[in-house]
């Protein structure tokens, strides 16, 4: 969809999907756009390097949530998670699997908290089901309300608040 600004015939407004805004800013076919910072962080590094974030806006807040299923009642903190991750490595001879649609944000967050013994599992959707199907031990996802996570009954025990929408 295309819009315009009255008395500004040289300006065209394109209504695009938030992910497409990032792609087009990166390839130079857009001059300015509004999109989620999470999408920028998940884009290719060469795209990230081409985009200048101008201003943080005060809407569209979302959290990157690390969530575990209820049976893991002994995991209450990130330190507990790191301990479990080492147990997986030492006793089960495998890494703790984390299902996510946001590998860059997840990796950066877990590393920043000292959790290093994990393997990312790419999710294309219904991430909250991965622990129940045996595909991962825990998940990370972006949420603003937490409704989907609550509906699927995992316990959310830590989160990282992502920056709100920005002009890029």
Spell out what each predicted region is.
Residues 49-110:
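A conserved helix-loop-strand patch within extracytoplasmic ligand-binding domains
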Residues 10-12, 29, 93-97, 118:
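Short active-site oxyanion
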Residues 146-151, 155-157:
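BRCT (BRCA1 C-terminal) domain core and associated BRCT-interaction motifs
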Residues 158-164:
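Conserved small/polar residues in nucleotide/adenosyl-binding loops
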Residues 32, 39-57:
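Glycine/small-residue-rich loop that forms an oxyanion/phosphate-binding "nest" at active or ligand-binding sites
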